[in-house]
């Protein structure tokens, strides 16, 4: 670091800032400054020169970059403060500094030199920077704080230098110097003599008392009126460092315009030579303060002062006041209070803004006040709880008495604390921010000086100083940054810095300043203007980003209403003026356009909707030009915005892209936002944008209504519900994917209010895959029409109401009301599910149950499962409990489950194109279609055939039989049953219907749904075995139906043998109350008969199915004319027919475990459900757990009677086709059983072989162990014998006492014997344990058992 000091031999005990003090004192090297400058022997040398009067001024692009980019950045750095002033060796007590450092340098000097065009090229300036850093490294120790700060600054400096322009080009030199931007160059030529005289006189005075007269650039030649400032200058120390001193105490009367006070006694010869280059004139209002950052006012370095800045609060002698207090008045300028001193420009420390254009004095005042306000905020922050943990020791002055610090006052000459600083700030004793910073740094320096470095107070001080320096470095540097950024790019404050009126006191000087500026500062002005515009643009972007942020807390309803009214009034007033461009009012509802799956969806946080019956219809057609313009800009009411949000939520995903485009094209603030996710506040959108959105949404919804009307026209039938074709439904469902998720919960209340008007219901049905609802007459029969007498089963609850119309459950009742009265309401729910398989392939997710015992749910604008792709089916074991709500099904179902009561030929016409069985005869297609849908299509087809008989007399009997076919002959299903099966309550309702006069006995009430879920894996097998029994039953009872069904017997058999697909979707009794089990992925296209699970489970299913003692009694009484039970197709075995069915398979014929129950019904007892002969005990155990499922079979079997009665309605035409079909089924079942038997036999053989192999291995291992042990034993015995022989020989040979030697020889024998004994014990233990525990065998056995149990 360098030292720039006062003039001549004057002692400079006053350093402008505490920067240098602190920088050195933090190192612990410094002693307290001497308060009396005369007492010190040290003196500061002359400061480095900052001007070259004999050399022409030169400006280059690199020098300009160094000033405006490099130096400005370094000056604002938090570690820059020790380097902003020359090292004051007097204040810091560094007597050897100038012996070690021969070329002092500091950033203040470099800054002045750059402003005065001192350097000829950039290399000279860079050399000065390097000198400054090198001085710091030479004088200070490597680990010192000041060295670390210098390294940080140097790193930043080198980084900035690397960005400097490579080629240096000369620029035109701006004649007006940094201080006198408003002055012409000739002013400088007029004033030098007076300047010298003044500075000389001041120097003369300064030897007696510390004058506070700064030296500045030449000022305008005005008569030297000597006027003392009304306020005392005591607290204003003057120093020669540019950024150093706060010149607060010297206040100049703002009413005086003259700028120079020259005592007549001053001899000009006293001025040192540098003064000619930098004349020390008391600066008046004629010289504007530079609008620079950091330090507010730049003090003249040429005028020495003996006043210690640490004593700023102490009064100074008032004698020096007259020479420097030059009151002035600026024409036309508002007079500020005296506390905001109009200090001559030369007294101001160099501000950190590095461009030479100064701002007017008015701006200087503004800037000063802004920075002081910022300083006050720093003080407040340091007093806050946030920093209280380490700032509390500095809140109050050091209490020397209480703490016993008797030497404190001797070491610390100028105590300081935050409390004192705060008081001074409140009393406005600080005139510039640098004074405040000096006091704060003095406080820290005192702490570092008095306390040892490892003291906890020092650690706390360092923490607090870090906070202070960080905040202080961020202090606003220019007034133009203070005002909030506005879109207009010409804010008031920046203008003066670009091309402001000259701050001179006279109009002529003002004119000359503006002329010189306009001629010379073009380059700098352009650069500065560009920087300012960029900053403003950045601020505008930040403001827009803040505005576009979602409102953290939604305002209360009353406030929203008030704001709405205020907004309306304001818009009415502003409408004629603003036209289309209108500023939106405060935020109210939020709408976020958010992409789901790449397609933007719009989410609206709608406030509680105001009650209103329906939204006002949007403008139907544009008016004439002016009227249209007015309409386009007409502000939207709150209700219209809310309705628009609801309508946007109804749009399909592909339309939302256009919505985003409209918003982005009309709202500049959102132009660059991500289209996949846009957060929009409706209140921030212009009325024209909202109107355009309204027109677009209305047109989209109108098109959708028209397309729905067209599609409805061709459909016919008793229920006026249109059925979409597959392609239409696919597209419409896909189009409405993204908006369903978000709007479901939020818009439910809104639609609930509107759900009772036909127009509103259409509105809501449109966007959400409910085109059918537009054609449904919304007759609202009360829910009790179904609820009291026919409790809706879970399947009807979930899939019928929610599938038909998730928005309005009442629409289901509309369809019910249109059905003939002879059908109970649950059948209408069933008919809704009669849809071709291609429509139901996606209906895999369970909709929320809308049980009709519950109140009607609010209408919902979307189906949460709308856009989901087809999901693979889940195994039945994962099925949820029946009462659980089922999520709405896929949108395709919404469009297509509308063939309710149409004649079967109408169904064929609608569904033929996508039907997978186009090759089948037309009369078979309804059958196959009824097999495929995962919803209760068989029941529906039966009902439609019965219902439509009068309408289609010729085709009715065959069609009804064909529809019954899936009920009579479903193939053995796998465990995965597809659609939501009809609950048994459906069947009970059939019994209570006019067609079924007889009710179920109480003993046959369906078991609770939980029972049906206990063994979900058995459901398919149970269904299959019952279906087989039913085949025989219907072969005898309903031959006409079977004749029609089995007429195309080869093809029919082929179709029926499919275990997958939807044949087994005929309501299985086991699943009547169970939740819908999603189909396996391949079930929509049935696999071959040999597919997976059915084969394994048929035998078990049949055997488990049969132990039903209680329920089967009832079945024997059923005759073709009696329908005592709901018919569960394919599940009710007729008691008389089962023996025939069971005779087929060779391994089933013996059946010793079957017994007749009340009428010859073969029932397998629970304890007799054994596998065929040859099965090991494990296989038998595997099937025993399945016997408790018997109650489930009861449900299935008991549902058959009513269906049997319904099937008998067509004329009976006895044929033998039914029997042949049943035989073919029996053959298939027999083959499946045989195959399963073979598989089990093979598995048993493999297990037996594995068991034998393991036993052999075990035996071989034991044999090997025995052999090893025997060999060891033999070897041991041989060794022992040899030893005994040797011992005997030794005994014989010598009569001497050889006791020790036999003992020694016998010892190894004893060890060997002990070892052999242990081995034998281990062998026997293993032998004993071997038959009892074989862990490998046990684990394998458990695996086999588990496989057999769950397979």
UniProtKB/Swiss-Prot annotation:
It holds the Pfam family Bromodomain. Coiled coil: none annotated. Residues 504-522 are annotated as: NPS region. The keyword Nucleus applies. Residues 624-708 form the NET domain. The record marks 140, 451 as: Acetylated histone binding. One of its GO terms (molecular function) is lysine-acetylated histone binding. Residues 1-23, 35-58, 168-244, 285-368, 478-638, 700-799, 821-1334 are annotated as: Disordered. Residues 1051-1350 are annotated as: C-terminal (CTD) region. Residues 220-235, 349-359, 482-504, 607-621, 872-890, 968-983, 1075-1089 have a biased composition (Pro residues). One of its GO terms (biological process) is positive regulation of transcription elongation by RNA polymerase II. Keywords: Bromodomain, Chromatin regulator, Chromosome, Nucleus, Repeat, Transcription, Transcription regulation. Residues 208-219, 505-517, 725-738, 788-799, 994-1003, 1011-1028, 1301-1310 have a biased composition (Low complexity). The 2 bromo domains mediate specific binding to acetylated histones. The exact combination of modified histone tails required to recruit brd4 to target genes is still unclear. The first bromo domain has high affinity for acetylated histone H4 tail, whereas the second bromo domain recognizes multiply acetylated marks in histone H3. Chromatin reader protein that recognizes and binds acetylated histones and plays a key role in transmission of epigenetic memory across cell divisions and transcription regulation. Remains associated with acetylated chromatin throughout the entire cell cycle and provides epigenetic memory for postmitotic G1 gene transcription by preserving acetylated chromatin status and maintaining high-order chromatin structure. During interphase, plays a key role in regulating the transcription of signal-inducible genes by associating with the P-TEFb complex and recruiting it to promoters. This is Bromodomain-containing protein 4A.
């Amino acid at each position: 670091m360098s030292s720039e000091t006062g003039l001549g031999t004057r002692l400079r005990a006053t350093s402008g800032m505490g920067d240098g003090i602190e920088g050195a004192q933090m190192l612990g090297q410094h002693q307290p400054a001497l308060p009396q400058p005369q007492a010190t022997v040290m003196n500061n040398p002359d400061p480095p020169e900052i001007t070259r009067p004999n050399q022409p001024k030169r400006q280059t692009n690199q020098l300009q970059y160094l000033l405006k980019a490099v130096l400005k950045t370094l000056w604002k750095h938090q570690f820059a403060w020790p380097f902003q002033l020359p090292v004051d060796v007097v204040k810091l007590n560094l007597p050897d500094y100038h012996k070690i450092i021969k070329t002092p340098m500091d950033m203040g000097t470099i800054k002045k030199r750059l402003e005065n065009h001192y350097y000829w090229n950039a290399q000279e300036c860079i050399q000065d920077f390097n000198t400054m850093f090198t001085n710091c490294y030479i004088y200070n120790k490597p680990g010192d704080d000041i060295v670390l700060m210098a390294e940080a600054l140097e790193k930043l400096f080198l980084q900035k230098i690397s960005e400097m322009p490579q080629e240096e080009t000369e620029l035109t030199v701006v004649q007006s110097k940094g201080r006198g931007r408003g002055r012409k160059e000739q002013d400088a030529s007029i004033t030098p003599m007076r300047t010298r005289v003044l500075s000389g006189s001041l120097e003369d005075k300064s030897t007696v008392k510390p004058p506070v007269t700064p030296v500045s650039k030449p000022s305008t030649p005005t008569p030297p009126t000597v006027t003392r400032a009304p306020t005392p200058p005591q607290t204003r120390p003057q120093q020669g460092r540019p950024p150093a001193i706060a010149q607060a105490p010297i206040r100049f009367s703002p009413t005086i315009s003259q700028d120079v006070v020259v005592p007549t006694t001053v001899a000009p010869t006293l001025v040192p030579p540098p003064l000619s280059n930098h004349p020390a004139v008391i600066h008046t209002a004629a010289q504007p303060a530079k609008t620079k950052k950091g330090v507010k006012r730049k003090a003249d370095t040429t005028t020495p002062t003996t006043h210690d800045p640490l004593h700023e609060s102490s009064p100074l002698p008032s004698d020096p006041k007259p020479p420097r207090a030059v009151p002035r008045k600026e024409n036309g300028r508002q007079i500020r209070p005296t506390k905001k001193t109009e200090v001559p420009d030369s007294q101001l420390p160099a501000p950190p803004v590095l461009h030479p254009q100064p701002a007017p004095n008015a701006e200087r005042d503004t800037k000063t006040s802004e920075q002081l306000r910022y300083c006050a905020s720093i003080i407040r922050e340091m007093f806050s709880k946030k920093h209280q943990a380490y700032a509390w020791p500095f809140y109050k002055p050091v209490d020397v008495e209480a703490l016993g610090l008797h030497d404190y006052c001797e070491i610390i000459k100028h105590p300081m604390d935050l409390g004192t600083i705060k008081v001074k700030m409140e009393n406005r004793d600080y005139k510039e921010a640098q004074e405040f910073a000096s006091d704060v740094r003095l406080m820290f320096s005192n702490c570092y000086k008095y306390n040892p470095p490892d003291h906890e107070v020092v650690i706390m001080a360092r923490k607090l100083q870090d906070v202070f320096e960080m905040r202080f470095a961020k202090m606003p540097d220019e007034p133009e940054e203070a005002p909030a950024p506005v879109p207009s790019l010409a804010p008031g404050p920046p203008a003066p810095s670009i091309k402001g009126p000259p701050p001179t006191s006279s109009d002529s000087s003002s004119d000359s300043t503006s002329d010189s500026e306009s001629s010379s500062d073009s380059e700098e002005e352009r650069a500065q203007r560009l920087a300012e515009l960029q900053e403003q643009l950045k601020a505008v972007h930040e403001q827009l980003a803040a505005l576009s942020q979602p409102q953290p807390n939604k305002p209360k309803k009353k406030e929203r209403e008030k704001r709405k009214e205020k907004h309306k009034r304001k818009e009415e007033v502003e409408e004629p003026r603003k036209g289309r461009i209108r500023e939106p009012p405060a935020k109210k509802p939020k709408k976020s356009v958010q992409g789901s799956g790449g397609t933007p969806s719009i989410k609206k946080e709608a406030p509680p909707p105001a009650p209103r019956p329906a939204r006002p219809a949007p403008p139907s057609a544009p008016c004439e030009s002016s009227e249209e313009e007015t309409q386009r800009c007409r502000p939207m009411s709150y209700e219209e915005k809310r309705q628009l949000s609801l309508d946007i939520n109804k749009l399909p995903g592909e339309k939302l892209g256009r919505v985003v485009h409209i918003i982005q094209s009309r709202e500049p603030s959102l132009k660059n936002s991500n289209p996949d996710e846009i957060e929009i506040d409706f209140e921030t959108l212009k009325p024209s944008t909202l109107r355009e959105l309204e027109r677009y949404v209305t047109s989209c919804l109108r098109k959708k209504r028209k397309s729905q009307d067209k599609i409805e026209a061709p459909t016919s039938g008793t229920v006026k519900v249109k059925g979409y074709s597959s392609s239409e439904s696919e597209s419409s469902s896909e189009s409405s994917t993204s908006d369903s998720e978000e709007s479901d919960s939020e818009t439910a209340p809104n639609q609930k209010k509107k759900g009772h008007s036909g127009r509103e219901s259409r509105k809501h049905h449109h966007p959400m895959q409910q085109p059918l609802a537009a054609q449904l007459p919304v007759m609202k029969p009360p829910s009790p029409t179904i609820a009291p007498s026919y409790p809706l089963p879970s399947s009807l609850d979930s899939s019928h109401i929610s599938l038909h119309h998730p928005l309005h459950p009442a629409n289901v009742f509309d369809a019910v009301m249109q059905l003939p009265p002879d059908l109970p309401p649950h059948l209408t729910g069933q008919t809704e599910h009669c849809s071709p398989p291609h429509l139901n392939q996606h209906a895999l997710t369970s909709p929320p149950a809308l049980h009709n015992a519950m109140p009607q749910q609010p209408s919902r604008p979307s189906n949460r499962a709308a856009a989901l792709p087809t999901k693979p089916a889940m195994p039945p074991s994962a099925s949820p409990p029946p009462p659980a709500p089922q999520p709405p099904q896929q949108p395709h179902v919404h469009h297509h489950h509308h063939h309710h009561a149409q004649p079967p030929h109408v169904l064929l016409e609608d569904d033929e194109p996508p039907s997978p069985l186009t090759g089948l005869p037309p009369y078979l297609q309804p059958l196959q279609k009824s097999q495929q849908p995962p919803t209760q299509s068989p029941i529906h087809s039966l009902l439609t055939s019965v219902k439509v008989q009068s309408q289609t007399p010729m085709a009715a009997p065959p069609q009804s039989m064909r529809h019954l076919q899936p009920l009579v002959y479903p193939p053995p299903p796998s465990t995965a049953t597809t659609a939501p099966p009809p609950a048994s309550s459906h069947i009970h309702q059939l019994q209570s219907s006019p067609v079924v006069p007889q009710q179920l006995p109480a003993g046959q009430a369906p078991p609770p749904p939980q029972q049906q879920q206990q063994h979900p894996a058995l459901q398919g097998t149970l269904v299959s075995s019952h279906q087989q029994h039913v085949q025989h039953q219907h072969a005898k009872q309903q031959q006409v139906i079977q004749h029609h069904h089995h007429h195309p017997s080869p093809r029919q058999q082929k179709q029926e043998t499919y275990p997958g697909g939807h044949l087994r979707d005929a309501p299985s009794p086991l699943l009547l109350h169970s939740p819908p089990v999603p189909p396996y992925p391949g079930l929509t296209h049935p696999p071959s008969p040999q597919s997976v699970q059915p084969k394994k489970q048929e035998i078990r299913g049949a055997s488990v199915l049969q132990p039903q003692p209680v329920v089967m009694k009832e079945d024997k009484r059923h005759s073709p004319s009696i329908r005592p039970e709901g018919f569960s197709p394919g599940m009710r075995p007729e008691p008389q027919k089962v023996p025939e069915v069971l005779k087929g398979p060779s391994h089933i014929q013996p059946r010793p475990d079957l017994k007749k129950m009340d009428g010859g019904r073969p029932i397998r007892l629970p304890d007799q459900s054994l596998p065929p002969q040859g099965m090991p005990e494990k296989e038998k155990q595997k099937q025993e757990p399945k016997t408790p499922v018997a109650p489930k079979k009861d449900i299935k079997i008991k549902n058959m009677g009513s269906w049997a009665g319904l099937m008998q309605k067509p004329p009976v035409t006895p044929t033998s086709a039914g029997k042949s079909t049943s035989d073919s089924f029996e053959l298939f079942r027999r083959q499946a059983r045989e195959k399963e038997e073979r598989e089990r036999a093979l598995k048993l053989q493999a297990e037996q072989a594995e068991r034998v192999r393991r036993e052999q291995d075990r035996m071989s291992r034991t044999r090997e162990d025995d052999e090893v042990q025997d060999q060891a034993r033999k070897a041991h015995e041989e060794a022992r014998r040899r030893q005994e022989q040797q011992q005997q020989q030794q005994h014989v040979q010598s009569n001497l006492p050889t006791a020790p030697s036999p003992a020694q020889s016998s010892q190894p024998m004893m060890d060997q014997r002990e070892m052999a004994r242990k081995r034998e014990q281990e062998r026997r233990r293993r032998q004993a344990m071997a038959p009892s525990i074989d862990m490998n065998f046990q684990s394998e056995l458990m695996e086999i058992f588990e496989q057999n149990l769950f397979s």
